A protein has these predicted regions:
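Structured mid-to-C-terminal alpha-helical surface segments
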Residues: 1-44, 55-67, 71-227
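Glycine-rich beta-strand-to-loop/alpha-helix junction loops that act as flexible
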Residues: 46-51
Length: 227
């Protein structure tokens, strides 16, 4: 993991006021690389606000501590969890992970979620992030391996950030449309406002949004299989 001095320098050079946001972004880059090296991304596709910022929007994107994914193979719920637990069970390039398996990992009828604390020598209190894998539906469109937008700190990393299998752009946005229609959170509206100024396939987005809303309604009507 980068030293706290390096993180401070990166924050100063980028004009960031909050060093914690810079630190968190670096931590998320490490976790994405870890999941890539452990083969987890062969079964899940990156999506959500952090995906949009890291792969599409760059610095204009919204800050988030979440890494959101969706399952894209026939791997079971429990197998996904075991792969993630195994990956976070050991230190990775100076980054350690603290969590209570019984409290910080949980299933709903739609997803697997976890809240590990990521620690390193410069921050023993750690940074808490959220991991979530949607289990309710597989991608409509094929996932594509997308490169992360180059950051100045990439040259300081002990690895070259890998391209990460991600949902197609219009499919990510269609899930934002669905989320905005269901919960109207500022984060979704922020992401959609950034989308509005960019080129995209409107007909495809409209069709995907209808499918996502239909799938969501079907999931709500379905009994919770874990009760």
């Amino acid at each position: 993991m980068l030293t706290i001095e390096q993180i401070r320098r990166i924050a100063q050079q980028s004009g960031a006021r909050d060093i914690t946001k810079v630190e968190t972004d670096i931590v998320l880059t490490y976790v994405l690389q870890l999941f890539h090296e452990k083969g987890i991304t062969e079964h899940i596709a990156f999506k959500g606000g952090t995906m949009l910022r890291k792969m599409i929007f760059g610095p204009r994107g919204r800050y988030s501590t979440d890494l959101d994914f969706t399952r894209r193979t026939d791997i079971t719920d429990e197998e996904v969890m075991e792969m993630m637990l195994d990956a976070l069970g050991e230190p990775y390039h100076g980054l350690s992970f603290r969590f209570d398996r019984d409290k910080d990992w949980y299933f709903t009828d739609r997803s697997l979620a976890a809240n590990p604390v990521c620690l390193h020598a410069g921050n023993e209190r750690g940074v808490k992030i959220k991991l979530e894998v949607s289990l309710r539906e597989q991608p409509v469109l094929p996932a594509r391996a997308l490169p992360q937008i180059e950051q100045e700190y990439f040259q300081l990393l002990p690895f070259k950030p890998a391209a990460i299998p991600s949902l197609a752009y219009e499919e990510v946005v269609s899930e934002k449309v669905r989320a905005a229609s269901q919960r109207s959170k500022i984060r979704d509206l922020h992401d959609l406002s950034e989308v509005a100024g960019r080129a995209f396939n409107r007909d495809l987005l409209r069709s995907l949004a209808v499918i996502k809303l239909w799938e969501s309604d079907k999931a709500i009507r379905r009994p919770d299989r874990r009760r």
